[in-house]
């Protein structure tokens, strides 16, 4: 089936930021059958310096104009059943590595909508269109429980995310339920240390108390142990430090805690957190150019997930650079960081080349679309990072549960062993 019409409009993310939604009409020239698919671009609050440009110069209106003038005329007539044909055309039309002419938001929304159209045209689920007939492994959900940093307007802990993840759940429903229960249980512990807390949540639905990073970890550890004991599911906890947002060029500035740490002090601080709180997952512990510190931490904690987000920005070349020195055991994959599903797939391939685990991730300003769940299964990701609470978060989690039901006895779920 071929694209017969292409539209774009301004819509909003769950954070209230303006983004773009692309709508494609595809038609079978023989039968006359018509399908319509849509997709919107998510938006991040803390963006890596090497990500594609979200909007071209001139903002969202310039993005709309670029789509109507440059993109739509070129993609009409393309066969959506040919994987990545639209993505290739987007790169050809823009002609820059960072999608500076049309913007990454236009590129990823178009890429997603075309993939949805391809799957619908063939009558297969999107995860099968992306990953093939044997895509059947479900990822472990990694959820943001307590929030700080930029996602919480700088009012909570300096570390951006305090995370929970079931490590050995029997199925995807139990995995999601485990995180939900931890999120609920954490509130009880927060109120014990911050009696004035009124239940505020950040962009990703995480609690935002005014507590220190170490207090947040103590609370999360206790809640995770409690839920783990009740459900019989091993639970790991972790952090997304988002260290690039703390780095001033010389030191890591923890404003709320009144502490500045040089690179060596930052390394020892992170190592101490891993040891003291038995962290299984550590994302972006150092700034986005410090590949060597990542490699040193990974070498010291070989059995933990040391993960790069801003370090790699879903860029195959940066992933290869890190892979050659053993900078990480896991890679965050955010398709919008690189602009198309084709490029994101290339990033996954680069990660696999160096034995890294794949964590498909949402953005803090996400949308109600459930595409990410299918991408995670299609890419064979071990982990999906998509929050716990909030409509744009549960949309992905509920879709994973549906995929699990659809796959039935053929479904498997990742198991992670630590220690």
Curated annotation (Swiss-Prot):
Signal peptide feature range: none
Residues engaged in binding (2R)-2-phosphoglycerate: 160, 334, 363-364, 385
EC number: 4.2.1.11
Cofactor remark: Binds a second Mg(2+) ion via substrate during catalysis.
One annotated GO biological process: glycolytic process
Claim: Transmembrane helix is one of the keywords in the record: no
Listed pathway(s): Carbohydrate degradation; glycolysis; pyruvate from D-glyceraldehyde 3-phosphate: step 4/5
Keywords recorded for this protein, A-Z: Cytoplasm, Glycolysis, Lyase, Magnesium, Metal-binding, Secreted
A molecular-function term among this protein's GO annotations: phosphopyruvate hydratase activity
Required cofactor names: Mg(2+)
Top-level taxonomic group: Archaea
Active site (record annotation): 204 (proton donor), 334 (proton acceptor)
Reactions catalysed, as given in the entry: (2R)-2-phosphoglycerate = phosphoenolpyruvate + H2O
Family affiliation: Belongs to the enolase family.
Subcellular location as annotated: Cytoplasm; Secreted; Cell surface
Protein name, as recorded: Enolase
Sequence positions that bind Mg(2+): 240, 283, 309
Role according to the record: Catalyzes the reversible conversion of 2-phosphoglycerate (2-PG) into phosphoenolpyruvate (PEP). It is essential for the degradation of carbohydrates via glycolysis.
GO cellular component: cell surface; extracellular region; phosphopyruvate hydratase complex
Principal EC category: lyase
InterPro entries referenced in this protein's UniProt entry, alphabetically: Enolase, Enolase-like_C_sf, Enolase-like_N, Enolase_C, Enolase_CS, Enolase_N
The UniProt record lists the keyword Ribonucleoprotein: no
